[in-house]
Design a protein with these regions (language model features):
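Acidic, polar-rich low-complexity tracts and alpha-helical solenoid repeat scaffolds
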Residues: 1-193
Length: 193
């Protein structure tokens, strides 16, 4: 009797779980209760039902996280904070839902968001951020070599390579100029007057 009561309480939380676009506190509670039930009654006749419900609830959390990351991606062209947030949310999504059907799209969005961030950022941070684009692109093609997004992602990769090369050249020229000035300064300081 107690087992059935606990199952029914967990089941009612499952039924009460809100749509993905709403706060998911109830969904998390339902998952916890269903998992607790399975842990306490591993041989229950409701085992399969609980497993199916947990998968269904996790799909809801996945959809919520996907839509959140996608929203940051869509709003990201408007400001640098949104670009950073898009990359962070996409990274969190990939970590939390490694087997998601949305991961190919998310990996592409991550490349684009990081590229836009690198282009929009202050000069002294650009090289590092373009190098991140290169890293994200390589992760993308490693996982999705046949992706429909491949051609577009290649453009961001090539542009990023060119930017890293351009910035490295500027840095080398600046360093050479500093060395030359330092050398000239020391010659002036050591020359007899």
């Amino acid at each position: 009797f107690a087992e059935e009561s606990i199952y029914m309480a967990a089941y009612s939380l499952y039924k009460d779980s809100p749509n993905f676009n709403l706060d998911q506190t109830g969904t998390l509670s339902a998952i916890n209760e269903l998992q607790s039930y399975l842990n306490n009654y591993p041989d229950s006749k409701y085992r399969e039902d609980c497993t199916i419900m947990i998968k269904d609830l996790r799909k809801k959390l996945e959809k919520k996280a996907y839509e959140k990351a996608k929203l940051y991606y869509k709003t990201s062209p408007f400001n640098i904070a949104s670009l950073k947030s898009a990359v962070i949310e996409i990274t969190n999504f990939q970590r939390d839902f490694p087997d998601s059907d949305y991961n190919e799209e998310m990996a592409y969005f991550k490349v684009v968001s990081q590229y836009d961030l690198a282009k929009s950022t202050v000069e002294y941070k650009q090289k590092e951020r373009f190098e991140e684009v290169l890293k994200f692109y390589l992760e993308f093609i490693d996982k999705y070599p046949q992706s429909t997004y491949l051609k577009t992602a290649e453009k961001w990769y090539t542009d990023s390579q060119n930017e890293v090369t351009r910035i490295a050249k500027i840095e080398a020229e600046y360093k050479a100029l500093q060395e030359k000035e330092k050398s000239n300064t020391s010659k002036i300081a050591t020359s007899p007057q």
